[in-house]
Swiss-Prot record:
Pathway: Amino-acid biosynthesis; L-isoleucine biosynthesis; L-isoleucine from 2-oxobutanoate: step 2/4; Amino-acid biosynthesis; L-valine biosynthesis; L-valine from pyruvate: step 2/4. The gene is ilvC. Residues 186-336 form the KARI C-terminal knotted domain. Residues 1-185 form the KARI N-terminal Rossmann domain. NCBIfam families: ilvC, PRK05479.1. This is Ketol-acid reductoisomerase (NADP(+)). HAMAP family: IlvC.
Length: 347
């Protein structure tokens, strides 16, 4: 599989376009500011009254309503939350989109599951940084980048001197992606593997494992503080080693005792039943059931902040003992407070 770097992308392509970034959340903030600082003409499209309007203006960005930002755009990057994208596209983007404009996404959810069906005259591409927006922004400002994926769903640029893939690479370069490396995939592959990774391993699997470990120690009489350190705080130390050089690299770095414990106890936690459950999760994603369940839950929201399933679980997480003991311990760790990835005042 080819990996594309800075020398493989022509940043002048995206610098010659008017780019509309729809949304100013974690990813929208990163993309808009990174492209702006790369010399791209960027307009942030937001709904009137959005709390993000002032934040974007304070960052030195041009801000307009979604409809107004789209009218003159050559490329529209839709970075609003997945559950809002279809309505925004149908009501504000589609009626104002230039015939030849390029639609871009950072996740294939709405295209792959056919919630958004673009016109045939619009090229459809994906530039998907493989990291949270806060990381995309912080690595860019530090001179680095986050590995990214690109995908082409529709290339309608037959009259141009460049292809939709050239545009995707150019955008990725302006966003810092080619500093780290860019891989090409498909909307289907990105969507299904991304959702599976989030649910079974990175978010759902990991947080459930952390909480179960914490609860096991506390229920056995150990202090919440020690349980927090052993089951949550140290995860970064281990995942950094894995990310750097793989699982064997982590094994090389840890003690023989820890390595032996990995081999004999890990399979008792992650069993054949766990893998069977993972396959069920993947099947729900592939069939579109997860997408429909998620969107149905969102439709029951009165304020746009999540439906009953989302809200009940979000509140349960907030009151879990690991959150309160963690907040107290982190407040005493000065090294954690020096450079935060998430600053809710600006992103």
């Amino acid at each position: 599989m080819k990996i594309y770097y800075d020398e493989d992308a022509n940043i002048e392509i995206i610098k010659g376009m008017n780019v509309s970034i729809i949304g100013y959340g974690s990813q929208g903030n990163a993309h808009a500011n990174n492209l702006h600082e790369s010399g791209v003409s960027v307009t942030v499209g937001l709904r009137e009254g959005s709390s993000s309007w002032a934040k974007a203006e304070e960052a030195g960005l041009k801000v307009q309503t979604v409809a107004d930002s789209v009218i003159q755009a050559d490329l529209v990057m839709i970075l609003a939350p997945d559950e809002f994208q279809k309505n925004i596209y149908e009501t504000e983007i589609k009626p104002n989109l230039k015939t030849s404009a390029i639609l871009a996404f950072a996740h294939g959810f709405n295209i792959h599951f056919e919630k958004i069906v673009p016109e045939a005259t619009n090229s459809v591409i994906m530039i998907a940084p493989k990291g949270p927006g806060h990381t995309v922004r912080s690595t860019y400002t530090n001179g680095g980048g986050v590995p990214s994926l690109i995908a082409i769903y529709e290339d309608a640029l037959s009259d141009e001197d460049y292809s939709a893939k050239d545009v995707a690479l150019s955008y990725a370069k302006a966003n810092g992606g080619t500093r780290a490396g860019v891989l090409e995939t498909s909307f289907k592959e990105e969507t299904e593997t991304d959702l599976f990774g989030e649910q079974a391993v990175l978010c759902g699997g990991l947080t459930a494992l952390i909480k179960a470990g914490f609860e096991t120690l506390v229920e056995a009489g150990y202090s919440e503080e020690m349980a927090y350190f052993e089951c949550l705080h140290e995860t970064k130390l281990i995942t950094d080693l894995i990310q750097e050089g793989g699982i064997a690299n982590m094994h090389y770095s840890i003690s023989n005792t820890a390595e032996y414990g990995d081999y004999v106890s890990g399979p008792k936690v992650i069993t054949s039943d766990t893998k069977k459950a993972m396959k069920g999760i993947l099947e729900n994603i592939q069939s579109g059931k997860f997408a429909d369940d998620f969107l149905n839950d969102c439709r029951q929201s009165n304020d746009g902040t999540g439906g009953p399933v989302m809200k009940s679980n979000r509140e349960a997480t907030k009151i879990h003992p690991i959150e309160s003991v963690g907040a107290e311990l982190r407040s005493k760790m000065k090294f954690l407070n020096s450079q935060k990835l998430v600053d809710k005042e600006i992103n």
